[in-house]
Amino acid sequence: MDRPVKPAPTGKVVRIGGASGFWGDSSLGPVQLVRSGGIDYLVFDYLAELTMSILAGARMRRPEEGYAVDFVTLALRSVLKQAVEQGIRIVSNAGGVNPKGCAAAVQELADELGVTVRIAVVEGDDVLPLAAAMRDAGTVEMSSGEPIPQRLVTANAYLGALPIARALDARADIVITGRCVDSAVTLGVLMHEFGWAADDFDRLAAGSLAGHIIECGCQATGGLHTDWASVPDWADIGYPIVECREDGSFVVTKPPGTGGLVTPATVGEQLLYEIGDPAHYLLPDVVCDFRRVCMEPAGPHRVLVTGARGRPPTNTYKVSATGQAGFKVSGQLTIVGIDAPAKARRTGEALLERGRRLLRESGFADFLATNIELLGTESAYGPHARALPTREVVLRLTVTHAERRALERFSREFAAPGTSWSPGTTGAGGRPSVSPVLRQFAWLIAKERVTPTVTLGETTFPVTLPPPQPPLAPQPLATSQGTLPAGPSKTVPLVQIAFGRSGDKGNTSNIGLIARHPALLPILKHQVMPERVQEYLGHLVQGPVHRYELPGIHAINLVCEQALGGGGMASLRNDPLGKGMAQLLLDMPVEVPERLLQELPS
């Protein structure tokens, strides 16, 4: 039975459109939101963890670069004039490692289009000059306990929302930041609009959740949804809008007439994306507790979100850094025909054997690491693969080495199998290129060592943070292991009783599961225990699995450590970001009472 539609509360509403989920997202988002969204603010998120390294390399080659150029050349060029005419203000972290360079490019575009804008720049996140002193003082990496590396490419503190709010208070039309937490571009808007104080922690948590929901673009409006076939019109999928109120409640929706799907399930999946312990979601401005968040229908493609709680933040910023750890090369070949998997496996092994001989003869050491994947044979499923003998396989071979020249020598061999070995070998696509292996490192830095600043025109001013408050423990939450009611049961795949969404943080993958009906939550908790998940995904997950509960949305969150082969650019896997982890787990068999399967809607 469908839940009744709950009317949204009345009062001032601030409408914020999430125009970009990453650097490389569609250029249609800002156009769609400005033309049909009726929004007050347009916010952009461009900075994945490793994007900063890419931007740092760009700035080393050309000092005027180092920011997300698409923000200026595509996004703003297509909407800036209309945004100014409609009074839409813009907040973006497109500044990367060169926020002032980005601001200069925006000003140049505004002049070209004949519009007047006040552009503010938030800086202070670059802590690379402090890394050596912190290393000497004994600071270590958060997860591994390793010392901070000697050579880093980038090191940036995740700033919060307060500098953005202060820039808007100063009447900026456009705010450009470097590294900040993704949700800060939304929370900063709400702190400015509603005058939320820096110690109004419940509202700060709610505003952060609103930002978290829209920070990945269409992932909140049906993108990556478990029930993908129910999501209409992918080609014109609607970008997300949050309609926010002073009390912290907000409605998630999308522009009218667009594709996509906004339901408690699609929004709930995004809540679970890339989070750890939902009672301790750490941000620079607030420690969020999302366990009791509730989501209710508020009309077609409208979901009302309430219930976020907050506590005082810590006195530290998280630093995200990247350092080079050798080089890698990855190439693909398509093998067609009889015994394709066996031919592909032998091709990969022969390439490695030949490569090692060539390295020895050229005076190079062996590869640091190698990985062969046979795409099309369910290689990601490990022991759970059930692919029928296939007659078409993509061989994906990745290797790493300490020296670029060694891999340049090896990469010349990737095309040779097309005439040397297996029949049906095709699809080489040219010689693969060698790229740096960038490892992520994270540590904490005292907030007192970092000074965020806002520059507006010729004026630069520091942003003073409120004095730290003692930490508070979250309210206790009754938990249980779940039960399996008496009576006959049936074995079904997990996807039959749950929605799923997975994400990454470094080498950790989280898998969020939402019961398809509240009555199924006890079954979900009973059947999906951490030790069972660790066993089922043991071919991928090398560390412990932790489970957390979010009863407000009838969900659990599984945090799998050492699950991504190093994660990001350090991983040799085809899925280094864990995008498929939830899909793998949703195939796990679970026992469900037959009575529930018969009584609940399909």
Where are these regions (language model features)?
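N-terminal amphipathic/basic leader segments beginning at the initiator methionine
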Residues: 4-34
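N-terminal glycine-rich anion-binding loops that anchor highly charged ligand groups
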Residues: 37-56, 81
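Short, Gly/Pro- and small/polar-rich lid/capping loops
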Residues: 274, 278-301, 468-498
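C-terminal non-catalytic interaction/assembly regions of soluble proteins
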Residues: 307-491, 505, 510, 514, ...
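Helix-rich interaction surfaces within compact, conserved domain-sized segments
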Residues: 540-601
